[in-house]
Curated annotation (Swiss-Prot):
Protein name from the UniProt record: Manganese dependent endoglucanase Eg5A
Role, per record: Secreted manganese dependent endoglucanase that acts by cleaving the beta-1,4-glucose linkage. Exhibits high activity toward carboxymethyl-cellulose (CMC), barley glucan, and glucomannan. Displays low activity on larminarin and xyloglucan but does not hydrolyze hemicellulose substrates such as birchwood xylan, arabinoxylan, and arabinan.
Keywords: Carbohydrate metabolism, Cellulose degradation, Glycoprotein, Glycosidase, Hydrolase, Polysaccharide degradation, Secreted, Signal
Protein's organism: Phanerodontia chrysosporium
Matching Gene3D superfamilies: Glycosidases
Cellular compartments per GO CC: extracellular region
Listed EC numbers: 3.2.1.4
Length: 386
């Protein structure tokens, strides 16, 4: 497992430039300002990142700050893994051929025994409703629900994200922009809300990785319609609101975020409307390479600033990951340490991926046949579970 050296920040002399609230003020390799403007405290969040957090005076800290009090109704700190399989063969244009593969249910108890408390279970729209806008397939729902229940039963505090994994599309057409109508999109969520609305540990992942959306404002209206439909069905679950550009955490503050923060909850308040973001660590942010080139801390810092400035909202990093390589073991550990330290603004993470992926998959965290874990899980994920 990775070992971190402790960081001690020295008091800077007067006259040195000061960092603004929420700006970086220290960390391994940091060469900028190490004092904060009046009213902020330079606090160590992890060995690579210290931040100017509003406080009583400008001081430095050699240990992480106490965890902020979560707002009423906030999600608890979460950490876990995507258990893929029912999404296999969904293309990025929303087309699908296949039957899906059931994730091994033994993985849930395996990971939960180590502290995981979040499982994201993706599925193809076409498997759940073979006819667009039609009724849910009871045979598939029974199969899918067995997986959901196995995850929930693996621990009393485990949450499950049911993830519609279709890229805001059905067979090439974008929702409300030449493809499925808003009513057809709402139909599947109405039915899923009727199924899972009684269990508050089921989080509704409204859509995986919308991308190349001609009108983001139209897409946000579609998201609002899904929220309204879920609430009209009587469900009070937490909802994950997806942005654009493949749910990019980097694009969120300037692209979809300013519109998504205006989505309202018929229940009142915003504590159950959580933003859904993704960020990989390879050279092109695609999650297709075994090596990592960034820990995304600066990207996530900007996201945190945006969320705190817009109503102290929460987000989940529901996809991130890397290969079982030394670069990813180090950089993913840094990223997840920051996510954990940024609670409650960042509610948690789920790494990609286990489930029906075999151990040769480039981003696998699927346990080996002998029950041992992948190096990435041992060195980067497990130390940062809740």
């Amino acid at each position: 497992m990775l070992k971190y050296a402790s960081i001690a920040l020295a008091l800077a002399t007067l006259g040195v430039a000061q960092q603004q609230q929420w700006g970086q003020c220290g960390g391994i390799g940091w060469t900028g300002a190490t004092t904060c403007v009046a009213g902020s405290v330079c606090s160590v969040l992890n060995p690579y990142y210290s931040q100017c957090i509003p406080g009583a005076a400008t001081v430095t800290s050699s240990s992480a700050p106490s965890t902020p009090t979560p707002p009423a109704g906030a999600l608890p700190r979460l950490g876990g893994v995507n258990t893929a399989g029912y999404d296999f063969s969904v293309a990025t244009d929303g087309s699908f051929t296949g039957t899906g593969v059931s994730p091994p249910v033994s993985q849930f108890s395996h990971f939960s025994s180590q502290g995981a408390n979040l499982y994201r279970i993706p599925f193809a729209w076409q498997l759940m409703t073979p006819t667009l806008g039609g009724t849910i397939s009871q045979s598939f729902l029974s199969r899918y629900d067995q997986t959901v229940q196995a995850a929930l039963n693996s621990g009393p505090n485990v949450f499950v994200i049911i993830d519609l994994h279709n890229y805001a599309r059905w067979n090439g057409g974008i929702i409300a922009q030449g493809g499925p109508t808003d009513a057809q999109f709402q139909s599947i969520w109405t039915q899923l809300a009727q199924k899972y609305g009684s269990n508050q540990r089921v989080i509704f992942g409204i859509m995986n990785e919308p991308h190349d959306i001609p009108s983001i404002s139209t897409w946000v209206n579609s998201v609002q319609g899904a929220v309204n439909a879920i609430r009209a069905a009587g469900a009070t679950n937490y909802l994950l609101l997806p942005g654009s550009s493949w749910s990019s955490a980097q694009a969120f503050p300037t692209e979809a975020g300013p519109l998504l923060v205006k989505v309202t909850d018929p229940l009142g308040g915003t504590s159950k409307l959580i933003f859904d973001v993704h960020k990989y660590l390879d050279s092109d942010n695609s999650g297709t390479h075994p090596d990592c080139t960034t820990d995304n801390v600066q990207v996530l810092q900007t996201l945190v600033q945006f969320l705190q400035a817009n109503g102290n909202r929460q987000a989940i990093l529901s996809e991130t990951g890397g290969g079982n390589t030394s670069s990813c073991e180090s950089l993913l550990a840094n990223e997840l340490a920051y996510v954990k330290s940024a609670y409650p603004t960042l509610a948690g993470f789920s790494v990609w991926a286990a489930g029906a992926f075999d151990t040769t998959y480039v981003l696998t965290v699927t346990p080996n046949a002998d029950g041992s874990d992948q190096p990435l899980w041992v060195d980067a994920v497990k130390p940062n579970l809740p």
